[in-house]
Amino acid sequence: MSFRFSLTHTDGAARAGTIATPHGVIETPAFMPVGTQGAVKALTPRMLEEAGAQVILGNTYHLWLRPGADLIARRGGLHRFNGWGRALLTDSGGFQVFSLADRRTLDEDGVSFRSHLDGSAKRLTPETAVDIQACLGSDIAMVLDECPPHPSPRDAIAASLALTTRWAARCQARLRRLQDGPVEGVVPTNAGQVQFGIVQGGVYPDLRLESAGQLVALDFAGYAIGGLSVGEPNEVMYEIVGGVAPALPAAKPRYLMGVGTPTDILEAVERGIDMFDCVMPTRNARNGQLFTRLGPLNIRNARFAEDDAPPDPECACYTCTHFSRAYLRHLHVAGEITGSILNSLHNVAFYLDTMRRIRQAISLGTFTEFKREFLSRLNQRADAS
């Protein structure tokens, strides 16, 4: 199955559709659980699929450093390596290089840095990022972009987005070269892999539109909005998304990277975004915070020690249909790994079910009403009831 995006319904700017990939169909709007090291923390592929996941995200930077892209390619690619049979998106590694790695040196050709694992010298270029992702065999690969910190001066952001555009063109050329025939040292594991461009431009609306226009001219399979949810006010993020989305082709998917909370997702869907990823469901779960339809629930709270109610009475996930708040609190307090598993399963199921309900509301033309009611209930506190 080749890559294809189809819109099925619209409701205002909100869109519902499907993305066909070599590893199955993704219904949009979609949330992608994050599998940083090739695994979504505390969850198996079977758990993810039973929870409704149709696509997950893998991290190029981490998988390149450990266990290595070549090793994964020799195993037949990331799908075979980690046992995930559905769609897979990989980021380019740029965000991690600019946020995790030590002693970075940036130039026109790429970025040199030292691994956060062992201090070894590494060099990431647009071509390297493409080669790594080709070896991983993701269905959707992201181009390498520069990720300047927030806040940054306008002139620095302008220079950064220009570099990101040049790198995007190099990424595109490299993928075409790999698809034309063998390249020594690179073993692609997914002939149907496509690339998404990444719109940058900081908090400057005109620079965002400039970046979008340059990337649209390169004609990628889809487009992401990067560099948001990095400390800017939510209202600024919503303004940027609302300005950029209409500048991207309606016939191609739009992906808001690293976002986010249920509220952020609803606001972005309302502005025309189709894809999301965030570590929040699993990270919060490991810290004892559960998402529910009546707001957040901190399972650490002592008042749940003898509470026999399910975490979320309206949730049909395995955790909520089999276990009580009292038991989950016990597991968390005891440091039992089963607690992280059950909490993570619930939070991921909550996100995926929220996306299902969003898609349904768009198809019925009731998204505005759904959003209003959902946020009204979500802004309560389940652990205060």
Model region roles, listed by residue range:
Residues 1-18, 26-30, 42, 145-151, ...:
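C-terminal extensions of enzymes
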Residues 1-189, 302-305:
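Non-catalytic, usually N-terminal nucleic-acid engagement modules in DNA/RNA processing proteins
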Residues 24, 56, 91, 133, ...:
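Conserved, mostly hydrophobic/aromatic
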Residues 54, 139, 221, 274, ...:
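Short acidic/polar active-site loop segments enriched in Thr and Asp
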Residues 128, 132, 159-170, 210, ...:
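A non-catalytic, amphipathic alpha-helix used as a structural packing/dimerization or gating element
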Residues 150-153, 158, 222-228, 337-340:
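Glycine- and acidic
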Residues 162-165, 174, 178-182, 190-311:
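Glycine-rich phosphate/ribose-binding loops and adjacent secondary-structure elements
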Residues 174-186, 252, 358-370:
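Surface-exposed helix-capping loop/turn segments at secondary-structure junctions
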